[in-house]
């Protein structure tokens, strides 16, 4: 919710398989839906992804292309990928900036450290 309130962009948190939390988008459409193959690859790369080109559209879920990934920050705990913090965009929205990148990276780091406790 905090990222959504600060950026106005839909924000989702996933585990390895699907979406576990949604803010700024319909929970019915995105909650508990499996992540897309492309988002799964981003998680496996273990580095923060930021969309650079408006033509590049990576869907958040396998079931819907209504939201695409702006920033995706993998949640890492003890070297394992647990999920991802995703800041998304709808068609026509501009790519994310440095603020969104930093917020996603910070929240993913916090969640990863919290899971290690």
Per-range role (PLM):
Residues 69-76:
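A short, aliphatic-rich beta-strand micro-motif
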Residues 1-6, 34-40, 84-117:
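Juxtadomain coupling helices with adjacent low-complexity linkers
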Residues 1-64:
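Structured interaction and signal-relay segments at domain junctions
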